[in-house]
Amino acid sequence: MKNVTDSFLSLGHWPFAGSFGFFNTDILSTNLINLSVVLGVLIFFGKGVCASCLLSDLLDNRKQRILNTIRNSEELRGGAIEQLEKARTRLRKVEMEADQFRVNGYSEIEREKLNLINSIYKTLEQLENYKNETIQFEQQRTINQVRQRVFQQALQGALGTLNSCLNNELHLRTISANIGILGSIKEKTD
């Protein structure tokens, strides 16, 4: 026992370079006491756990974590593939709807274009009719104005001729002749 006590007392005299205080970390100068202390600590804290069992458990745990990670990755991959397929399906559907809208839009544009052309033709036809009616109205008005002027000029010319040709005597004779004609018409009707 004295040797053991001396060994512990002599630990204080060991150099600290490369040591932890109680243990000599230099593998070549490690003595039997250090090895026994290390083995005692391992046995005390290990309590029936063998190194191969501990290593096996560590490897099994690591294997389970890796398998779980792979399983989770596969599930995520499957979900991502499913979402991708749904997105592709929606994309195809939207593209088909866009094509239908495009075709319907072109058809609608063509219909609107034809409606606009027809409307313009109708408007032009109405304008042509209004123009023709206006021309006819103006022609008729001009003809009426010309007739009135011709009539007025003819009347003035006739009155001028009558006034220049008629004197009092001729005027009285014309009146007497007209009275005679009216009198004979009256006798025939009675």
UniProtKB/Swiss-Prot annotation:
Membrane topology listed for this record: Single-pass membrane protein
Compartment(s) where it occurs, according to its Swiss-Prot or TrEMBL record: Plastid, Chloroplast thylakoid membrane
Residue ranges of the TM segments: 35-55
UniProt keywords, alphabetically: ATP synthesis, CF(0), Chloroplast, Hydrogen ion transport, Ion transport, Membrane, Plastid, Thylakoid, Transmembrane, Transmembrane helix, Transport
Pfam families membership: ATP-synt_B
GO CC, any one term: chloroplast thylakoid membrane
Any one GO MF annotation of this record: proton-transporting ATP synthase activity, rotational mechanism
Note in the entry: In plastids the F-type ATPase is also known as CF(1)CF(0).
Role noted for this protein: F(1)F(0) ATP synthase produces ATP from ADP in the presence of a proton or sodium gradient. F-type ATPases consist of two structural domains, F(1) containing the extramembraneous catalytic core and F(0) containing the membrane proton channel, linked together by a central stalk and a peripheral stalk. During catalysis, ATP synthesis in the catalytic domain of F(1) is coupled via a rotary mechanism of the central stalk subunits to proton translocation. Component of the F(0) channel, it forms part of the peripheral stalk, linking F(1) to F(0).
Known partners and oligomeric status: F-type ATPases have 2 components, F(1) - the catalytic core - and F(0) - the membrane proton channel. F(1) has five subunits: alpha(3), beta(3), gamma(1), delta(1), epsilon(1). F(0) has four main subunits: a(1), b(1), b'(1) and c(10-14). The alpha and beta chains form an alternating ring which encloses part of the gamma chain. F(1) is attached to F(0) by a central stalk formed by the gamma and epsilon chains, while a peripheral stalk is formed by the delta, b and b' chains.
Xref: PANTHER family: ATP SYNTHASE SUBUNIT B, CHLOROPLASTIC (PTHR34264:SF3)
Family per record: Belongs to the ATPase B chain family.
Protein name: ATP synthase subunit b, chloroplastic
